[in-house]
Regions:
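Conserved acidic carboxylate
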Residues: 11
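Receiver (REC) domain active-site loop signature in two-component systems and cognate sites
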Residues: 60
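Active-site residues of response regulator receiver
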Residues: 57
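Alpha4 helix (beta4-alpha4-beta5 surface) of REC/receiver domains from two-component response regulators
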Residues: 67, 74, 78-79, 87-106, ...
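Charged docking surfaces used in two-component/phosphorelay signaling
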Residues: 18-26
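Acidic catalytic/metal-coordinating carboxylates
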Residues: 36-39, 64-68
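Acidic, metal-coordinating helix/loop segments flanking the phosphotransfer/catalytic sites
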Residues: 33-53, 93
């Protein structure tokens, strides 16, 4: 099964965002970028139906990852979310227990880990459809 799609990368740190985008493009994905939570919400308001997956940074200035999720829920915008963070998965699962998170990805991550995570989330989404 071929799993490709449009991925939104939400990351305020430019080097991390560029690295993530380059890895996803290397894996064959088309990528949109947002430098903060406000831009991410704007992109999703206009293109949520096209976006297959969002990689969302947990900690950003302005709107945090948690605030972005809360706003998307208020607006009824749904997209599978992989939360990215330097924090460990267990603490993130506790903190984000009230939100729908498809998976967690601890930074720094390697190409193989990103590939496995993204493809697993997209495969689960395809099976649910």
């Amino acid at each position: 099964m071929s799993l490709a799609g449009l991925v939104l990368v939400v990351e305020d740190e430019d080097p991390v965002r560029r690295y993530t985008v380059s890895l996803l493009e290397e894996l064959g994905f088309t990528v949109l970028q947002a430098i903060d939570g406000i831009e991410a919400i704007e992109v999703l308001r206009h293109r949520s139906g096209e976006i297959s997956l969002m990689l969302l940074d947990h900690s950003m200035p302005g709107l945090s990852g948690e605030e972005v999720l809360a706003e998307l829920e208020r607006e009824g915008l749904t997209v599978p979310v992989v939360l990215t963070s330097g924090y460990d998965r267990t603490s993130l699962e506790r903190r984000f227990a009230g939100h729908e998170i498809a998976d967690y990805l601890q930074k720094p991550f390697r190409l193989e880990t990103l590939d496995e995570t993204v493809r697993a989330v997209l495969a689960n989404r395809a099976q649910a459809s």
